């Protein structure tokens, strides 16, 4: 009788251990994807430009923030959402429908890339590479390029101010 009880207990322990191993090796995570190929995303706003929204009483283009249009995009969840949003903006990807509605961008600019970013007490400093001086030009153009990046960055509540380096960027 004792041998039968011992064997029964041994079977129960082995079964419980097997079940525990399955649970431990495949935990249910409420914060991550359930399947390995599933990606967690977040929605960000990229700011593009529509000159029809940026005209004064005389129908002149004002070259102001009034022409900025936020478009929602999905990006992969990461520890660097600000940089990810700026990098996506720099790609300048608009759909045909967005272009048909009057939304434009001069991005991508050949050679322009985000080199780094730092956030200190609400001031976001963005460092760019611009080996071909593509961020220069007329005051209207460079203002809109600046506004697009600034508005895209300021959607994040921790960003209160945006600075660009080198300082030669976005100069008329």
What is each model feature region?
Residues 1-172:
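Bimodal "functional hotspot" detector
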């Amino acid at each position: 009788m004792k041998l039968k009880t011992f064997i029964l207990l041994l079977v129960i322990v082995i079964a419980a251990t097997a079940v525990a191993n399955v649970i431990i090796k495949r935990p249910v995570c409420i914060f991550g994807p359930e399947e390995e190929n599933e990606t967690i995303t977040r929605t960000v706003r990229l700011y593009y430009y529509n000159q029809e929204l940026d005209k004064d009483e005389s129908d002149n283009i004002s070259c102001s923030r009034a022409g900025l249009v936020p478009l929602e995009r999905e990006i992969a969840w990461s520890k660097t959402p600000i940089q990810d949003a700026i990098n996506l903006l720099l790609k300048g990807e608009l759909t045909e429908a967005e272009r048909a509605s009057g939304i434009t961008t001069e991005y991508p600019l050949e050679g322009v890339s985000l080199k780094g970013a730092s956030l200190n007490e609400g001031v976001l400093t963005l460092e760019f590479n611009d080996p071909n001086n593509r961020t220069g030009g007329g005051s209207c153009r460079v203002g809109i390029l600046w506004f697009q990046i600034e508005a895209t960055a300021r959607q994040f509540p921790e960003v209160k101010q945006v600075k660009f380096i080198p300082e030669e960027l976005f100069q008329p």
